[in-house]
Amino acid sequence: MTDDRPVVLITGAGSGLGLASSLFLAGRNFRVYGTVLTEAEERELRQEAARRGLSRDGQGAVTALRMNVTRRADIDRTVDTIIREAGRIDAVVHFAGMGLRGFLEDLSMQEIRQLYDVNVFGIMELTQAVLPHMRARRSGRIVITASAAGRMGEMSISGYSSGKFAVVGLGECLRQEGALFNVQVSVLEPGLIYTPHFGINRNRARRAQDPTSPYYFWFCQHEAIVDKLLAANKFTAEDIAGVVHKILTARHPRLHYMVGFKLKLMVTLRNIVPFEWFERIHEKIVVRMVAHPRHPATGLSGLDAGIGERAKSHHAAETLSKIHD
């Protein structure tokens, strides 16, 4: 008997958005191959699938595969396994990723390279591996998970945001390249979504957590704001899974799928008003929230402290100039 269920490969399926989407799609008659990084994640995916009755040979199917997106050998082995078992890959959903929080000066190049290996190059390599199969069948769908951070830059996430800007651009390029062979590409752009993984480990840069860092005060304020936004956010991983299902089943999927009214509003504003105006709006909403709280030791707001530091630097430069004169 021919198995005509759509075959989807989902990376990062051991937790968070990837786990939720794997279970959601399997429950809607997709044959899901979910990649996981660790034994614990593999166990979590298998147990949750079994609990929901999503057996490998039943109506819904979830198969866990160990894969590190930074290793080409893992990628090739995974793709070969799916082609051998299922005969094709109808869709790929890229969820595997990591965070990196901290001001640029506090990020080590090792931390940044590791981030790009997973969040950017991992997407590129896996896409390269599946495209020949999709191209040969003249059919396929690719979903790249970006972020609100790929549309708007913000302090304290310069490394992460720059990587997300990169994959948004990648998605737009692939959209045109894939169309030549009926491979449809979409970019999923959620805002802040609380998941257990995000709540436990935001992957803060080592130097960013050092109280001697010149950015430490602002970094802590920004993290506090993120906590508040997460607490107020109503979107869940299951909501994102629903959007993924919509992308994979739409007759003509769009390029961009932004999740959240506020995100859509901010991106629309950025696109239609002069950037200088948008920058002022963004400064009032975000930058001043970070800069204005009073420092417990000095009594100054972060903004005042920053102005004070700049004033000191200017005074020092003037003094040095007079000495040289």
Sequence positions of predicted segments:
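Conserved glycine-rich cofactor-binding loop
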Residues: 14-16
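Conserved glycine-rich Rossmann-like NAD(P)H-binding loop of the short-chain dehydrogenase/reductase
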Residues: 28-44
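Rossmann-fold cofactor-recognition segment
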Residues: 55-73
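Substrate-binding pocket helix/loop in short-chain dehydrogenase/reductase
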Residues: 103-104, 111-113
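Active-site helix of classical SDR
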Residues: 127, 163-166
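Residue(s) in the substrate-gating loop at a strand-loop-helix junction
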Residues: 147
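C-terminal beta-strand-loop-alpha-helix "lid" module of Rossmann-like NAD(P)-dependent dehydrogenases
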Residues: 180-231
